[in-house]
Amino acid sequence: ELERPSSEDHFSQIIPPPNVTGTLHMGHSFQYAIMDFYTRYHHMKGTDSYWQVGTDHAGIATQMVVENNLLNEGKSKDDLGREKFLDEVWKWKEYSEGKISSQMKRLGITVEWDKYRFTYDDDFCEGVNKAFVELYRKDKIYRGYRLVNWDPSLKTAVSDLEVVRQEKDGLLWHISYPLADSDEALIVATTRPETMFGDMAVAVNPNDDRFKHHIGKYVELPFVGRKIPVIGDEYVDMEFGTGCLKITPGHDFNDYDIGKKYALHEVDGVVQTSDKLEDFAPINIFTDEAFSNDMVPAPFNNLDRFKVRKAVLEELRNKELLVKEEKHHISVPRGERSNIVIEPKLSYQWYVKTEEMAKKANEAVNNGEVVFHPGNWDKTYFNWMDNIQDWCISRQIWWGHRIPAWHDDEGNTYVGFDEAEVREFYSLDDRDLRQEEDVLDTWFSASLWPFGSLGWPKETKDFKKFFPTTLLVTGFDIIFFWVARMMMMSLEFTGKVPFKDVYVTGLIRDENGQKMSKSKGNIIDPIDLIYGIDLEDLVTKRTANLMQEGLAEKIERKTRKQFPNGIDSYGTDAVRMTFYSLATHTRDISFELGRLKGYRNFCNKVWNAARFINNYPMESQEFVAKNDADKWIEDEFNKVTEQIHKNIAEYRLDFAMNEVYEFFWGKFCDKYIEECKTSGETANLHPMLKKILVLMHPFCPFITEEINELVFKDGSLMKK
């Protein structure tokens, strides 16, 4: 923990709060090493440096971990009920938080632990409620019936970030839809025949000579009898499939947009178009578990969606309406956490209106108030922000900030800080009120983190001094989900940007370039690199709490082959320096143990050089050049120091680390020390070592402090 200088200059940053789902992974440690570097570096320049630490409650992710733990005990969350289940989650949170803080301390990070925050602590809850209520009362939050990514296993809406695309070979079915009052038919091509019960139109391209004369006619939907219009829209690709596209607004995002454009709605078994958006009424054919509902006729109702597909195809064959089946490459959306196929589904959710907020956030980047490093990431930022949609902020789970809204028996909704404030604000009588069951998307509370963690909505000393923060270190994968939203919320509630510089790191992958994940069995705990771990413990760690069956054996085989002797201990400094050497401006970063060995050797070199110098008497701590070798090393030191400061300012720690390595090993050890040995002129060895220790300290704090104590015995380098 730093003893902070009383300086008007200040440097501040917030930790991207790790989820209380378990322990830290390599990506966390990589970013925290970078953040710790900048905290130490600015502190040593006499700047009041502050790094806000804390963890994230991580709604769905944490709830799933606890549900899986219960499952292993033969229990479910429904057996426990909401309150008892939440008690279990709080217990898990305490366990996980203990592990995480222990890991952070072992990485040597310099934070003030007594100012630790949690995105679900009492003060943070107050801030989250204030943000929600204020946005609602400014007409920037609303409740709407819209299409969302629905996870039928978790029975909740999930964000785009929590959906992964599985590319695979699938099938495209050509189905005959008879034209009403005609012997003709239109052949539609679809990868999802099971959704035909929700069809509300057939779309063709108005420039397609094959079909344009059918626009305005109706087709009869097989099995249902509903009459649906043939509409002309240039969205339809004439080259894809048959050129006729079934439009199912209740179960496809593109179809939803088309359905909305024509305000499709059903009246007495006939789907009509309208120029009034409020007429739009998409049809939902699935339950929350993705079973067919009562909108689907027998014998297809009350079946799992994939059984519906099978039954529909069989019946289409029987009726000779299945014209053709062909191979087709498809992209299947799966829940990142559940691995279940995501269903686009209509449901009531809460939304934030983002268009106006996004414009303000864009201005902040355009006018240089917020700068991305490397600069090319602002293109990614603008690409997302220029196509922003209203943000779905509700989740149908139990763990999280419960939405501060109450409903009465007549279907009215009231929003406020608590039930008493709601009754007062809306002048309500003693009618029964029920609180909204849904909780907020984790990203909603996370978007308040830069100012909420510093004390907002209270005007605390830290909030006044350290907000806006100086630097945000984050991964490119959450530029939109977190960075952009922090900017929108910060400008909305404080009128200021949340940070000035955004240092975007690449993602740490394994030596083969694969993403590190529990299911791939390639995760390495950074603490095991520091202290080492034997093979049996490593196997146990990698195969524990796997959420998918059958993986343990495969992961065990892979681990035994890759690490026959377990993992050696490399020490904190070698791990940190390896991370800095990897802090390139590339998107993907491969982590190799060979590089780690190189930096452990470097630490040994530093230690041996210091011990060698310590054999000589210390004549002075002040460097005064007495010969050509002294002048040369002084000149080289000044040049490398200037270059390193430049690299640090430009967020190129990879270049800076390389400069340190090359200077210490190649110039100081191999040339200057050897020259001093030969000439016997050793008076400047101690003073130059001292300068180097100060320069190197943010890169390798432990060994530099230990050497300084051994050789100079004059207190911490952090005070130099």
What are these regions (language model features)?
Residues 154, 182, 224, 338, ...:
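Short Cys/His-rich metal-coordination motifs, predominantly Zn2+-binding knuckles/fingers
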Residues 7-15, 37, 73-76, 101-108, ...:
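Active-site-adjacent bridging/hinge elements
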Residues 16-24, 82-86, 111-118, 239-245, ...:
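Glycine- and acidic
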Residues 7, 157-185, 390-391, 401, ...:
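Flexible, glycine/threonine-enriched loop-and-boundary segments that flank and lead into catalytic domains
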Residues 103-111, 123-156, 170, 385-409, ...:
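Helix-rich, typically C-terminal accessory recognition domains appended to large enzymatic cores
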Residues 59, 63, 82, 97, ...:
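Alpha-helix initiation and N-capping motif
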Residues 27-39, 55-56, 124-127, 185-315, ...:
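Structured ligand/cofactor/substrate-binding pocket environments in proteins
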Residues 1-207, 248-261, 265-295, 305, ...:
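N-terminal, positively charged nucleic-acid-binding surface of large information/translation enzymes
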